[in-house]
């Protein structure tokens, strides 16, 4: 099962963690330098909930919390 919101289509996106070393120029150093860049994923906050469908039935779906808070989904 893909980790994708059934309502908004939110999915994991790629990003990176950037590690820096050194003292910033602002605080009297010669500047910071990038030492490593590590790949990572930003995952949406998905919850498996029972959703009321327009025809009156219910169905379990993976829904992002952002969609729940916005009122795009009605919990059964």
Curated annotation (Swiss-Prot):
Keyword DNA-binding among record annotations: no
Sorted UniProt keywords: Ribonucleoprotein, Ribosomal protein
InterPro entries, sorted: Bacterial_rp_bL28 (IPR050096), Ribosomal_bL28 (IPR026569), Ribosomal_bL28/bL31-like_sf (IPR034704), Ribosomal_bL28_bact-type (IPR001383), Ribosomal_bL28_sf (IPR037147)
Source organism per UniProt: Opitutus terrae (strain DSM 11246 / JCM 15787 / PB90-1)
GO molecular function terms noted in the UniProt entry: structural constituent of ribosome
Protein name: Large ribosomal subunit protein bL28
The family this protein is said to belong to: Belongs to the bacterial ribosomal protein bL28 family.
The keyword Nucleotide-binding belongs to this UniProt entry's keyword annotation: no
């Amino acid at each position: 099962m893909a980790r994708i919101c059934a309502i908004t289509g939110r999915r994991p996106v790629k990003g990176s963690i950037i590690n820096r070393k050194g003292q910033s120029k602002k605080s009297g150093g010669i500047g910071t330098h990038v030492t490593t860049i590590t790949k990572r994923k930003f995952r949406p906050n998905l919850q498996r909930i029972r959703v009321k469908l327009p025809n009156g039935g219910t169905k379990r779906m993976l829904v992002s919390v952002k969609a729940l808070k916005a009122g795009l989904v009605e919990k059964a």
